A protein has these predicted regions:
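Conserved catalytic-core motifs of GNAT/GCN5-like acyltransferases
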Residues: 54-56, 72-95, 218-230
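Glycine-rich acetyl-CoA-binding "A-motif" of GNAT/NAT acetyltransferases
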Residues: 1-5, 100, 229
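Conserved acetyl-CoA-binding loop-helix of GNAT-fold acetyltransferases
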Residues: 24-26, 30-47, 52-55, 175-184
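Conserved GNAT acetyl-CoA-binding A-motif
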Residues: 45-59, 67, 189-199
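Short, cationic low-complexity segments
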Residues: 119-149, 248-275
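Conserved beta-hairpin
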Residues: 1-5, 207-210, 215
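A conserved beta-strand-loop-helix scaffold within acyl/acetyltransferase catalytic domains
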Residues: 1-27, 154-165, 169-175, 183-184, ...
Length: 275
């Protein structure tokens, strides 16, 4: 048997890969095996010519997050309630008990990233600047579209974990009506949370964000290079209560991102409740 294990996972043709969760048996801990595996996988990703690597550490503890930060990764998104409550390490303390489990999205560019010129609503400019600064990428904002044209392109998927994924590849003139109908259909199927993504290079992003917020979606983060090599904006909608303060978060930059998401969620809830 092996005392540890880790792997790079990449979709066919993708320019990025996920560094899968590394596992070290208890008897072999304290020998820097986790750090050495991480370094080896980063070297392999560079050999493959990838643009970057990402990881999705849990928030029930900070061990994986600590390793990701040591490897130069920055937090770019927080996915709340995307795993069942029982999806926790066996035999470990569970400070997040009583709610579905959440994951971080950590990312590291393996080469100097090109400057980003994106479309985003003004209320998200500051947090987006901070995320891209942490990632080491220059950022500028484009003027929003005066009007949308054509039809939307959207893909919908329901995961066994109870998450409904809504992926816009193009934002068209009917996006607000389309999104409301999609959300209604997925909620009727009993999903526990909804995830929304759209390419930040689409001029219709501010319109989509307005429509999404009207449906109850709040900011979740950015997925660099996830949209056929381009970056995607991420938003979320939760069906069940979730206390962000229960999440175990290691780095100050990650805590700042989580605080913004918590604030955006509260602001949206107050607005939609008429407060």
């Amino acid at each position: 048997y092996r005392p540890c294990g880790a792997a790079l996972e990449r979709a066919p043709g993708a320019s990025i890969a996920e560094r899968g969760e590394a596992v070290v048996l208890p008897a072999y801990r304290g020998q820097r095996l986790l750090e050495r595996m991480t370094e080896r996988l980063t070297q392999e990703a560079q050999t493959l010519g990838l643009d970057g690597v990402f990881a999705q550490p849990v928030t029930v503890h900070t061990f994986s997050q600590h390793n990701d930060a040591r490897a130069g990764m920055a937090a770019c998104a927080l996915a709340l309630g995307v795993r069942p409550e029982q999806a926790t390490p066996k035999g470990a303390p569970v400070p997040t008990a009583g709610q579905r489990q959440s994951l971080l999205l950590m990312f590291n560019f393996l080469r100097t990233p090109a400057a980003r010129h994106i479309y985003a609503p003004t209320q998200y400019h500051e947090i987006l600047r901070k995320i891209y600064q942490a990632l080491g990428a220059d950022l500028s904002f484009a003027a929003p579209a005066t009007e949308l044209t054509g039809q939307s392109g959207v893909a919908i998927k329901m995961e066994k974990s109870g998450v409904g994924d809504i992926r816009f590849t193009k934002i068209g003139v009917g996006v607000a009506v389309e999104l409301r109908q999609i959300c209604s259909d997925l909620l009727d199927f009993g999903v526990k949370s909804l995830r929304l993504s759209a390419p930040l290079g689409d001029p219709g992003v501010p319109v989509l964000v307005d429509a999404a917020r009207a449906c109850g979606f709040f900011f979740s983060g950015v997925a660099p290079c996830f949209e056929d090599g381009a970056d995607a904006l991420l938003m979320q909608y939760l069906v069940e209560p979730l206390d962000i303060d229960k999440l175990q978060i290691y780095a100050d930059q990650t805590k700042e991102l989580a605080a913004f998401i918590a604030g955006d969620r509260i602001e949206l809830a107050d607005k939609n409740s008429g407060k």
